[in-house]
Design a protein with these regions (language model features):
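A short, glycine/Asx- and small/polar-enriched loop/turn
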Residues: 37-47, 92-96
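Oligomerization/assembly interface segments of phage tail-like spikes and tubes
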Residues: 46-53, 111
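N-terminal leader/targeting segments
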Residues: 1-43, 54-55, 61
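Extracellular/mature segments of secreted proteins
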Residues: 43-49, 122-126
């Protein structure tokens, strides 16, 4: 998988996750951000990406369960934490990891792409034109 494919998979997985909730107003918290991963900088890279929206529901546990079930359907290992706020964590599947947080104030979906061959510095230069 190329770095671009890993990034695109991350973005589509995060944004697709938002569609399982009855929530409008989702917006990215910034462009996908490339960085080094693994133990040899310059040889492997991954991206981080976040998406947020104001919650329309107050049933945070039910929304978290919807996200957890969706991620399980993608073949991910899922863990739900309910204190101090409800957070869903997932690893595996099409990305390295994802989290869904219900607070404070906004819903957040954050993810990290798979670690793939590539130089983060060169990828950053390419992304910035």
């Amino acid at each position: 998988m190329s770095p671009e494919q890993a990034r695109d998979t991350l973005v589509s997985t995060v944004e697709e996750t938002s569609t399982v909730l009855d929530v409008s107003g989702w917006a990215w918290t910034g462009a996908p951000e490339v960085g080094n991963c693994g133990d040899r900088p310059g040889e492997r890279a991954n991206d981080n990406y976040g998406y947020s929206a104001p919650p329309q529901s107050r049933d945070f546990a039910a929304d978290a369960q919807k996200v957890a079930e969706h991620w399980k359907s993608l073949g991910m290992e899922v863990r739900v934490v309910d204190s101090p706020s409800v957070v869903v964590y997932a690893t595996g599947g099409p990305v390295e990891g994802l989290s869904f947080s219900t607070g404070p104030g906004n819903y957040y979906i954050f993810g990290t792409s798979l670690c793939v061959p590539g130089d983060a510095s060169e990828l950053r230069k390419k992304d910035n034109g």
